[in-house]
Amino acid sequence: MKQLKITKFPALDYAGNEAFNTLSTNLSFAGANVKKIMITSCHASEGKSYLSMNLMRTLAQRGIKVALVDADLRRSLVNSDYGLQFEGGRNDGKGLSHFLAGMVGMDEVIYQTDIPNAIMVPVGRDVPNPLALLTNHHFAELLDMLASMADYVIVDSPPVGMVIDAAEIAKACDGTLIAVNYNDVSRQELLDVKQQIEQTGCPILGTALNQVDYDNYMGRKYYKSYSKYGKYGYYREYYKRNHEAEKK
């Protein structure tokens, strides 16, 4: 298997570690049949790739085998933001788009990362017709292969509210986790995304809140409108534990 280094991966602080440990634990309650998990958002810049990458790392550090697929064929920033370095010191390599276009075989796009227990399929190069590639049956075959190699397959997808790609990706997944920027997405937008994903037959596992203002977190009515979707509301769990500890 080819090697891949992740050269820009900031360490999480205490709150971040607690959040992702909680999320990782909660995934185990989703059921043994939930292995292929799409991570998406309503808008761009809501932290879906941050969520995907850190969930991959946290699971791997806990001894859980995990594969990450960068399926944002339109606007992926993973290669640059995380400093992916391929064999030979190159900053670009064969990836998902190359495989789906029939340019290389499946084994050419699966990389062992420098994180033990974590493998990765990078995005590859930009393509003019990503939707056509994602509807290719080879995409589902790739996810099935990765699911046979790992305990979880995390699929970083484009935002649901912007393009139709995520709906196609969801068809090949067992569940969806939605990254939501706190105080930045309306309830109706989230409901629209929820409906669009559910129409594909892919269950929604929950939401993960980003950019949370802890000081005002517990009292905001705005948050309460999301609470029934927040099965994996890992920031909520972290805040609740520490808030209660401070009162003792």
Q: Which residues fall in each region the model found?
A:
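P-loop NTP-binding module
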Residues: 1-248
